[in-house]
């Protein structure tokens, strides 16, 4: 039988009234008696302080202060102490007979807050002979002693062999030691546990039914179901781990995304700016060099332009000087051409007028003849008209008196008479008396012939007259011609002068015929002269251009020399062109190759970066694609091996997890079906009965029961026989044992215990030998021990699994990286460095550019020489054909000579032109000038006579014709005879009148017509004369004007003048064109010089600015490079692929990254400030500072517990691996979190049943307790209705609420709380969260309602309330409940410490006088039966015959207050013994 631990004594050092007092405590009841202020409460306060040294709980109040909250500032402890060091120590001996002294050192703290400093300590291994007061006091003399400080106490104990001194910094450690050594009944892990313990002590101290205890009986009596709690805790822990894992995944993802985002954007932001500055620095250097080259080139160009400007200005001056003379010559030539054209027009007019005059003269002569003939005819017609008029008048007068009306006969008679009259007239006129009408026709022919002859004679005379008249006119005309040519002269001199003029005209005509040959000869000579002058000008210009004077004889040799030079230069230019083409072709090929390499360089650089990363990750150097593929095969093999090992570790880990899960089942049931069967059969699992077996006994009981250790203990086997029929859902071997689950023991077997084994005699003929298992799992302690070892193993396996998973992930990522590299970069990674090739090609390109520049200069010079030689040859080609002209020195004299001859010929031509017609007219008639015509008058008379004869012959012929016409009238003789004489006469007169009127009409008509014709002829003659005179005057004027012009107007004059003018115009135009070209070229040259000057100034300014910028940038760049190298970020920032992007692209890249960074670090004030500072474009080093700050920030964010690197870039990869591991871990854990609501309900219900049974067992111990009218005390335990409904729903209707338990957003606790709220909507949950409510619902104690009931008198069982009980009954009832609580605590704590320790049991009772003797006796009996120590305080001795009684009296001696203590043991069975440290009542001891 294990002895219960006891408190041996209480020691007070330097308390108020107690300097060094030790109270030996009785094994049952210790009574402190004394009056008011004797020190009873102080003694109990010292005990409680040593037991619970928590200033937040201690509150020592008087009974009169009950309910007061502010009666004492120090809660009663400060005033119970003396100044200086104070101690309160408890001397105990536990079940193992170990002496343990625990206590506290107290000391008042100076100040108005009246604080107390408490230091708990413990002493082990102290010999029994050493008293506690000897430890903490030092005797100075017989009456004086000194209290040792805690440090002195420690030093003192250190000197004692085997004694251990422990000082505690926390109350939890202090209580943990007291629990382990069996001083207190419960492990006080927290302030809540200490509060419960203190409230228990306080309730026992002041007595009665404590409301604090009553309200929380569940917490005091119902132990925490560690199995259920642990299961739920494991589940919740797993859920929390899931949440933590999810949070870790989220954080890792966030960190990874943050790292990726920050590194990516910061790298883009800074690297783009870094590379842009690097590119700009290179560009600025190139620009500075280009500016310098362009500056030198521009200076050379300016000097060349200045020389060119001087040459062109000089040439322009020469052309300006020549232009004036050329303009004057051109104006003179134009004027001369105009004069020639005017003279030619005058000459053409003169010739046209002369031709017109000749034609007019001919027409005038003809018209004179026509007018003369018309005048003669007019005279004849006038005469005939007069005769006819006379005849009519005469006939009219004769017929004035005749009849006016005649008949036909009269008419015929008249016609006859007229015919006779006509015949008579014909006879008269023809002098033919014998003329008859019949012979009239013959005579008519005769007289017509005579008329014809007369007419011919007239015509002959007329011709003669005309000839004579012509001869007369020819003389006059010839005379006029001579006078016109020679001027006025005598008619007698006309013949001599005419001959002289004709002879001179022949000579002049001969000279005039030489005008055209002479003119052509002169034109030819003048052309040659002009060519000679042009040749001289060309020669002078050639010499000027060549800068040397050449003789004519040297030109041919110079021409040959220039031809040879042209040939050589042409070959050079041709070869230079080919060479330039080859150089340019090579340059284009180089440029194309460079462009191709520049396009390929970023790809190659990316491949190299990837290859370098692979090399860094695997620690290998690769030089060929074959090595990469071989290493990839090695990676595959390594990955396969790592996966195999990981799977093995994972399988073992899963097995451990399954075993842990199996061992963690409530009641030790490894098979869940056993719990259901036990509940079905109304039994209890054997493992649950032995659940509290110790770890040392576990192997024995495991071997004892063997395979039946998983049996079900049932009250009666016969009652379950029927239930076994048809049972299928059970293990293969189901063991059933009959027995009482509440009082089951191992007496069912006959057992012989051997060494580490047992022999179980199952029957007479069946034994079972079972060895003690090396790893027992029978009992909670064994299972927990096994679970603990499995957890340790699982930790090792988990760490190994995590390491292997990490390695596998790393290998897989490395394999993926190699695969990506092979797919993307393998084809280019091992090619030659394109940048090195670009540098080589750039060097070659520079050489080619230099060669091209040199070649261009040489070619330009050769072209210039070639052009000069070509110009020289061209000039010589124009000069060489004119060398004979240049050598002809007499050409100008011959031109003058021919010009004189031409002038003479032109004078003769002008004479011939002026008088040639007169001479031509004079030459045929010059002979008429020898004599004047004399018979012109005789011819006129003969012509008049002949004209009269012709007129007479015409009249005769007319008369005969009339007779012939009237021959028919001669037959009207009878009509004439019939008429009287008057009638015949009238008839005849009428006939004659008619004839006369007809003749008169004919004469008038002829006269009118001839008069009109004569008038017309006269008008034509007058107009001809007028026109002739006018043109004659105009001709004279034109000849005078032609003479006034003074220009030869020959046929070639205009052509020569025009040719001369055109030549001069061409020269002038050429001169002007050249001058304009020179002016434009000069203007352009000046503008070019001005542009070059401005360009030079700008280039000098730009060059100096660029040079200053380069120098400044170099200093800043050096600082940037120093900062980059010092911080080791050059590899991150010097991204060579960015060197191939333009500045705009890099700036855009940097700006985009800047915008992303502003959003990414908006919550980080430090990085935000650094980023804001880095935006200054003039301070590029601040961007490096920002990049370093980002890296430093990321390094600080790296979780060193999971990431083994300081490099954020490498941390990203490890984060990826960690994410994969966490995801796998989360997946595996989620698969193990399946817990059903039915299981939860069964566990809670079974736990409730077990605890109800335990409470019933506790009630059995209280049935015999009675106080006053209270006959019995019991605890009533019921399940709350709302919670019972919850359990029913969880067990039977969980399918209706799977929306809660299957939700990924809710934990099981939260789902349980939601279900409780759903089932009980009327209950107000307050401000508590679903998680808090759910955790409460997972605790079975919250399902129970507990209340204390008493069987009092005739009232029967009723709720124990202070108002319904007397004071003594209430104190007794409360004490009974407290004893039950302590016993419950001991049962709960038994599994937490060894079974060989039974803890101390001690309660307090102040003011015990309120109990009667029977109640006191009941307490004594209860203490004896429960082996409980009790300290009672009472004013008087209530039961001195039992236990130990101390009499306390407070006295004052010499201003010193002390308590006089007298101890007395119970005297009922034997005489009291004097206790150590006390005296008998007769000899009281005093302490000072």
From Swiss-Prot:
Key words, A-Z: ATP-binding, Cell cycle, Cell division, Chromosome partition, Coiled coil, Cytoplasm, DNA condensation, DNA-binding, Nucleotide-binding
Biological process (GO), any one: chromosome condensation
Chief localization: cytoplasm
Alphabetical list of Gene3D superfamilies matching this protein: 1.10.287.1490, 1.20.58.850, 3.40.1140.10, Immunoglobulin FC, subunit C, MukB, hinge domain
InterPro entries noted in UniProt: MukB, MukB/SMC, MukB_hinge, MukB_hinge_sf, MukB_N_dom, P-loop_NTPase
GO cellular component, one term: cytoplasm
Coiled-coil intervals, chain numbering: 326-413, 444-472, 509-602, 835-923, 977-1116, 1209-1265
Record: residues binding ATP: 34-41
Example GO molecular function: DNA binding
Localization annotation: Cytoplasm, Nucleoid
Role noted for this protein: Plays a central role in chromosome condensation, segregation and cell cycle progression. Functions as a homodimer, which is essential for chromosome partition. Involved in negative DNA supercoiling in vivo, and by this means organize and compact chromosomes. May achieve or facilitate chromosome segregation by condensation DNA from both sides of a centrally located replisome during cell division.
NCBIfam families assigned to the protein according to its UniProt record, in alphabetical order: PRK04863.1 (NF003422)
Similarity annotation: Belongs to the SMC family. MukB subfamily.
Domain notes: The hinge domain, which separates the large intramolecular coiled coil regions, allows the homodimerization, forming a V-shaped homodimer.
Quaternary structure and partners: Homodimerization via its hinge domain. Binds to DNA via its C-terminal region. Interacts, and probably forms a ternary complex, with MukE and MukF via its C-terminal region. The complex formation is stimulated by calcium or magnesium. Interacts with tubulin-related protein FtsZ.
Protein name: Chromosome partition protein MukB
Organism, scientific name: Salmonella paratyphi C (strain RKS4594)
Gene: mukB
